Amino acid sequence: MKVLVVGGGAAGLMAAGAALRQGHEVTVLEHMEKPAQKILVTGKGRCNVTNDCTAEEFLHHVRTNPRFLFSSLGAFPPAKTMELFESLGVELKVERGRRVFPVSDKAEEIRQALLRYADGADIVHDGAKKLLLEPLAQPEEAPAAPENPRHPKKKKPGPAYRCVGVRGTSGREYKADAVLVATGGLSYPTTGSTGDGYKLAQQADHTLVEPVPSLVSLVSHDADCKKMMGLALKNVTLTLHEDGKPIFEEQGEMLFTHFGISGPLTLSASSHLGDMKKHKYEAFIDLKPALSEEQLYDRITRDFALLANHTAQGALVKLLPSSMQPVMVARWGIDPATRANQITREQKRELVQLMKHWRVTIDARGDLAHAVITSGGVSVREVDPKTMQSKKALGLYFAGEVLDVDAYTGGYNLQIAFCTAQSFANHLE
């Protein structure tokens, strides 16, 4: 079978290698000079290749459409990803949060391994401009879902087209029995993610869920963030509120920046943002999650007793990082010259509330150019979850970030690319 893979990224190269091992003839179209450029920026240049967890545990970390992955992840779980890369000569290690990295800490090693895996495919430097679609004379029909009792006899229309190839941006036509769109999303456009796959999908009448940046830093006009820029907080709890109601909570690390907040906690929280024109978002940071409010009050009382003659700011030396101390005192509203032994119980209670509920207003998402992934994409309702084949066009398939499936940080999104690519290759007939 002639297989055409559009996109030479993580999903594309994985699919190409797997299809080669099924005995197929494979061509990869890649419009960038070098394939898999985005791999080099993942995991801060170290490439968090997957997460060492079970398929069941994995699905709890998938933010959008986890059920779509039941089949592909079951057939190609993280353990198989690790086994594959080790067979390609990559030594792996498991770090905190079961994140899997190459021992070398070099993303280039993962990129080279994928290129070796796809060795034998014809990698062509060209983009994809247009799907070659042939209308089906009598679209095949599929029975309506059994859970729809109102229309038991109604038929759902089958594919209206057959995809027989792609016309490249060069004008050249590439004919194929199976065309896989694995072009990624819109994040990190300098690495080649320019949204071409969305345009191709729409040519076959696919529904597109609006692509938005996800796993991205958050913008806050709160001046306190800029005052603390560069401050990294560890072992804090971040709770994201939408219109006053908590919608996300997690403990970990975060960072204050000149434009707002960033770091792992922030990236995960960003995937829960909806329409920012319709909703108000705030982040609340618990600076001492290991202590209850009463325990923190007692801790503050002890510290202030030991540092009785220090100023209010000086008395915070054991409680907060130095760059946060003056900001805390200002938000606390206490006279900086106040001595620790002059601070009232009521003021200590106010300090407890500030430390347990440090508020950051969220004004915007970071842009797509700096997002780790794109949320949104080709609607999974129109893609077969076992084969990755389009329900709109026979011979057309999708894998990876181009699909409306995304997860938190931790190696989950690359694993989604790998397992959907493997499902495509392993179901070719």
Report each predicted region and the residues it spans.
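N-terminal Rossmann-like FAD-binding beta1-loop-alpha1 element of flavoenzymes
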Residues: 2-28, 424-428
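A conserved short coil-to-beta-strand element within the FAD-binding core of flavoproteins
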Residues: 124-162
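An anion/pyrophosphate-binding glycine-rich loop and adjacent beta-alpha core
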Residues: 33-41, 49, 55-56, 91, ...
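A glycine-rich dinucleotide-binding beta-alpha-beta segment and adjacent secondary-structure elements
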Residues: 124-127, 132, 152-154, 326-406
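Glycine-rich loop(s) and the adjacent beta-strand/alpha-helix scaffold that form part
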Residues: 178-224
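Glycine-rich active-site loop/strand segments that organize a redox cofactor
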Residues: 46-94
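Short hydrophobic core segments
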Residues: 4-6, 29, 173-189, 201-202, ...
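Glycine-rich FAD pyrophosphate-binding loop
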Residues: 20-44
